[in-house]
């Protein structure tokens, strides 16, 4: 199963992950979240995401350095994101190609892929991604 969700605030991210986990409790939950909005990329606000991905079996966060630059914001360190989400299992990407390649390399047997963003994960084409993952 693949789900695309507009969740981007901490409460919505947590609620979406929990709802998917409740409905697909026997499946591996791969939760991908894009830090995309001005507030989500703010180093003071990012701590609000604490434990939001804790029910995901494989939690992933993506952010774009180009988005940070266009919003005239300071770079975020991977370790700061891991610490803010309070999840040492968190996988962080800032390169959409590497993120996509990682997803394609995964085994999706008995899995749910959850893509949460108000953006598009660095211009990833969801239809192409779905075709690649289902082959």
Regions found by a protein language model. Name each.
Residues 1-135:
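ATP-dependent carboxylate-amine ligase
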């Amino acid at each position: 199963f693949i789900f695309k969700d507009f969740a981007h605030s901490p409460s919505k991210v947590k609620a979406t992950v929990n709802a998917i986990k409740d409905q697909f409790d026997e499946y591996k939950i791969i939760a991908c979240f894009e830090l995309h909005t001005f507030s989500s990329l703010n180093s003071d606000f990012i701590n609000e995401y604490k434990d939001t991905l804790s029910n995901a079996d494989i939690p992933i966060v993506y952010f774009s350095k180009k988005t940070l630059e266009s919003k005239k914001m300071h770079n975020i360190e991977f370790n700061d994101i891991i610490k803010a989400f309070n999840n040492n299992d968190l996988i962080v990407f800032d390169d959409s190609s590497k993120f996509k390649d990682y997803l394609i390399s995964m085994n999706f047997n008995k899995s749910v892929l959850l893509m949460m963003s108000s953006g598009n994960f660095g211009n990833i084409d969801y239809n192409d991604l779905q075709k690649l993952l289902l082959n």
